[in-house]
Curated annotation (Swiss-Prot):
It holds the Pfam family Ribosomal_S21. InterPro entries: Ribosomal_bS21 (IPR001911), Ribosomal_bS21_CS (IPR018278), Ribosomal_bS21_sf (IPR038380). This is Small ribosomal subunit protein bS21. One of its GO terms (cellular component) is ribonucleoprotein complex. PROSITE patterns: RIBOSOMAL_S21. NCBIfam families: S21p (TIGR00030). Signal peptide: none annotated. The keyword Nuclease does not apply. Keywords: Ribonucleoprotein, Ribosomal protein. Disulfide bonds: none annotated. The keyword Ribonucleoprotein applies. The lineage of its organism: Bacteria, Pseudomonadati, Spirochaetota, Spirochaetia, Spirochaetales. One of its GO terms (molecular function) is structural constituent of ribosome.
Length: 69
């Protein structure tokens, strides 16, 4: 759980910015969005396969570009 202690001389904006940074660092929002709706295991598997294929295609493109130079 993220907690932010605000000093007397510290402004609200600065404390809010620090809070947002801590949340981003701990990936709380990303995890919440991922779990917001139920996804079937088959859907998750299909998404992972598509992501893998995209990564492989990107690697191939970069390699071809590197060799072409």
């Amino acid at each position: 759980m993220v907690t932010v202690n605000v000093d007397k001389n510290e402004g609200l904006e600065k404390a809010l910015k620090r809070f947002k940074r801590m949340i981003e660092k701990e990936a709380i929002i990303r995890e919440w969005k991922r779990r917001e709706y139920y996804e079937k295991p088959s859907t998750i598997r299909v998404k992972k396969e598509k992501a893998f294929k995209r990564k492989q295609a990107k690697k191939v493109r970069k390699l071809k570009q590197k060799i072409g130079k």
